[in-house]
């Protein structure tokens, strides 16, 4: 019997520019179609770290030429990234399904996610976005543009922005209805458009980028998914990563995860939120499983052949 699965796809897996994205979504679609073909109901969430930074930089460059142009809020940049990533991914996935003789629909839902305007994350930016830079380039941007910057898991330096905790998925009912009607749904792009609920049902955009793994966990929990698959750049979670005593983990319990987190084993903004999201989902209801693995290993991971499985 097929499972209801939420996939959290990393923004870096979608390429650094539009041509790369066009190629990346084709490979991504093959892996997603494998799961659909196996009889699973699939909802796809994705990151947007590189993409939202590119959009923000493009508008900043335009304002240099047109100083009177409006400043585009970060929440609107997230919305734009949902649109253009969803467009490419939706078309590539539909094409792949049709090539396999599968008739499921594919729908992208512009998704808002509620955050707390008083979340301390707004005072302590941690979420990397945009292009990787050298330390010198990053320090220059910090001086000239007032950016908050940080090293990103040894891969270079990036701008960091606020990443508040996701509280509710506004379009949850729509996403559920589409999934139950045998559609592959693309939702919570970039962690969702961050909004703050004000009086009289008004939603106000927030200057933030929500972590897509935590947003995907929230979505999976409230869709009553059987499995959350968090895709990353490695086949399994490791402790002592990139050290001589590195150890790959086939399984991980919440208790073990908390011990490793306390030891600082997982990089903030990289593997840490993935493990935290996996633990939260596994603990949310008996029988739920989270899987952390490579995109191309997702189907094998479901079958228990690879990846790191997080269960209670």
Regions found by a protein language model. Give the residues of each.
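C-terminal catalytic "cap/lid" subdomain
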Residues: 2-312
């Amino acid at each position: 019997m097929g499972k209801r699965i939420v996939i959290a796809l990393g923004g870096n897996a979608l390429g650094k520019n539009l041509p790369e994205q066009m190629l990346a979504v084709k490979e991504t679609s093959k892996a997603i179609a494998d799961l659909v073909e196996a009889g699973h109901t699939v909802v796809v969430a994705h990151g947007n770290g590189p993409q939202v930074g590119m959009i923000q930089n493009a508008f900043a460059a335009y304002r240099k030429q047109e100083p009177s142009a409006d400043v585009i809020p970060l929440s609107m940049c997230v919305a734009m990234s949902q649109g253009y990533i969803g467009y490419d991914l939706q078309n590539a996935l539909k094409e792949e399904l049709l090539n396999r003789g599968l008739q499921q629909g594919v729908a992208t839902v512009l998704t808002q996610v509620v955050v707390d305007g008083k979340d301390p994350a707004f005072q302590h930016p941690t979420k990397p976005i945009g292009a990787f830079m050298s330390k010198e380039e990053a320090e220059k941007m910090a001086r000239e543009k007032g950016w908050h910057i940080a090293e990103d898991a040894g891969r270079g330096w990036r701008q960091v922005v606020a990443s508040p905790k996701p509280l509710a998925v506004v379009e949850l009912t729509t996403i559920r209805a589409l999934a139950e009607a045998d559609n592959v749904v693309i939702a919570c792009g970039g962690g969702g458009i961050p909004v703050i609920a004000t009086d009289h049902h008004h939603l106000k955009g927030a200057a933030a980028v929500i972590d897509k793994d935590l947003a995907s966990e929230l979505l999976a929990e409230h869709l009553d998914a059987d499995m959350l698959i968090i895709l990353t750049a490695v086949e399994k979670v490791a402790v002592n990563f990139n050290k001589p005593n590195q150890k790959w983990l086939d399984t991980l319990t919440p208790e073990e995860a908390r011990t490793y987190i306390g030891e600082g084993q997982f990089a903030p903004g990289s593997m840490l939120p993935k493990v935290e999201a996996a633990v939260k989902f596994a603990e949310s209801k008996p029988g739920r499983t989270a899987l952390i693995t490579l995109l191309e290993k997702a189907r094998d991971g479901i079958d228990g052949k690879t990846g790191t499985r997080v269960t209670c």
